[in-house]
Amino acid sequence: MIDFTNFYSSIAKNRLSHWLRTLPMQLHEWENTHVHGQLASWIRVLNKFPDIKTSHIELKDRVEIGSATELSPGETKKLENLLQKFHPWRKGPFVIHGIHIDTEWRSDWKWDRLLPHISPLKYRYVLDVGCGSGYHMWRMRGEGAEFVVGIDPSELFLCQFEAVRHFANKEQNVHLLPLGIQELPKLGAFDTVFSMGVLYHRKSPMDHITQLQDQLVEGGELVLETLVIGGDENAVLVPQDRYAKMRNIWFLPSAQALKLWVEKCGFENVRIADINDTLTGEQRSTAWMTNESLEDYLDPNDPSRTVEGYPAPKRALLIAKKAIKALS
């Protein structure tokens, strides 16, 4: 199974130590329910990776780990075949020992859009909710974050993350836990909390915003990115069934409605930093994700609409601060 003992050792010495009251039991229960099935086969793939100590780790401008010269051509081909077993790769891209993992999403584009708007991450404790395979977590570390924790219940994302971490000399300041936000206690320990591409999957968006708030220190920063529609503060789309072929889509507010929701939950200095149409250059099928992608989700005769007739995907980036309680 995945070994979480290094994470326990790390947080025992930092501001997350109080999490040890509940976390080991949670993850022990998770392990007991994931002994069989696809996870076991993915872990066998992880165990086949060569042990290589690399001196080349680039996280500031991209996620590039290891050099192509550290492996023979045969070893490179074998590693590429192993990495392909974690198909589909959704978020990236990654370069591992010269192997370019061309993921479905150009997550680096999103990072480039949001980076100018957020507070510097240097020395910060960061939580990434719904982190996927962890691409943005590596970029957070590249910006100098002291400790980065990602949570995502997907077994595949966990194994993809562990694959990258294996070649990053088993980095001990970036960790992914297979949990949902609803499984976290009120830690109140992170300087920055990211939630990107999660809110529209929640039946109760207000509860999600409050759960994010509970993880922040007072004065901490929320970075929230979600699908939005046009309109004023009263505009909210509730898809009848699917949206862009996606199940489990509940609420798509306007950017102004989103701002109002976050303010209503008690955040301060709430602002919409960016609104961006998702284009097929940013989300597309590749050799590392051969399933349908954005092009297949849009009306072929009108790309401004989804196949269901709703407005095409548009994403807003919201930044807010958790209020500091006044001294009594």
Swiss-Prot record:
It catalyses: carboxy-S-adenosyl-L-methionine + 5-hydroxyuridine(34) in tRNA = 5-carboxymethoxyuridine(34) in tRNA + S-adenosyl-L-homocysteine + H(+). Keywords: Transferase, tRNA processing. GO terms for biological process: tRNA wobble uridine modification. Carboxy-S-adenosyl-L-methionine binds at residues 91, 105, 110, 130, 152-154, 196, 200, 315. One of its GO terms (molecular function) is transferase activity, transferring alkyl or aryl (other than methyl) groups. CDD domains: AdoMet_MTases. InterPro entries: CmoB, Mo5U34_MeTrfas-like, SAM-dependent_MTases_sf. SUPFAM superfamilies: S-adenosyl-L-methionine-dependent methyltransferases. Its EC number is 2.5.1.-. It is an enzyme of class 2 (transferase). Pfam families: Methyltransf_9. The keyword Transferase applies. Homotetramer. Catalyzes carboxymethyl transfer from carboxy-S-adenosyl-L-methionine (Cx-SAM) to 5-hydroxyuridine (ho5U) to form 5-carboxymethoxyuridine (cmo5U) at position 34 in tRNAs. Belongs to the class I-like SAM-binding methyltransferase superfamily. CmoB family. This is tRNA U34 carboxymethyltransferase. It comes from Psychromonas ingrahamii (strain DSM 17664 / CCUG 51855 / 37). The lineage of its organism: Bacteria, Pseudomonadati, Pseudomonadota, Gammaproteobacteria, Alteromonadales.
